[in-house]
């Protein structure tokens, strides 16, 4: 009996030693978050001594809301949104930067819309929530007078002809456009313009980081290891993504997720490079801060140092 109780105490001690973290990606399971699923399934988080619980947001309740209310410890978030929230008073800390190139596209429905000037005064589809701040600023700066038509998700507005063009992510909605029979339509990638700013990063609150520095750093290193493994083993990583999607009953298919994974891995690398750095560039942050201030999205400069919250 004493031996049995001793074994239970050992097991309990082992569980306590592993620090619990609740991690929430921006969306439901998909290849955009493959590195974290790999780190979980391959035991990289366990090896780092951190117990991670991956919880996905709902359509009506975002990852940021979960972080704000304390239900999540670590989330993914786009850089533009993170800087805006910091300016509003949310003390966010960037602990890992996965994206290096912008994935936003402006896709025309007509062969005649090819330059920014061509889109002036046109009706363009835009998400009701998120991802469009750079497009709005592009509209104002270039005096395009775009008539924005909101949609929740999917490309039905574009496919039905209700808009002249639409915003789309290169790793997601653009595939829907291509398979709907519009594969040869002109488009503009924001990554080919002055609005090419990185997107996905991983964030915690400053308070959580200060109180849990070691386990946050362990999470970061295990996540980096997961993403590096994905770059080296994309097909097996895709198997893991599909397993997570099935578990969460996400309606998708391997073709869509394969497209997404290939594009996400490309966007994780700087132009001309084939390996990710996982870091933010100080000059990029400075340029984005200046742009956001010019458009009154933020009211004071935000530096790389402030984004990193004292992290090396």
Where are these regions (language model features)?
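Helix N-cap/coil-helix junction residues
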Residues: 44, 50, 90, 182, ...
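Short, surface-exposed acidic
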Residues: 145-148, 184-187, 247-263, 299-306
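Secondary-structure end/capping motifs
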Residues: 212-295
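Sec-dependent N-terminal signal peptides
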Residues: 4-14
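Pocket-lining segment of extracytoplasmic ligand-binding domains
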Residues: 80-81, 153-250
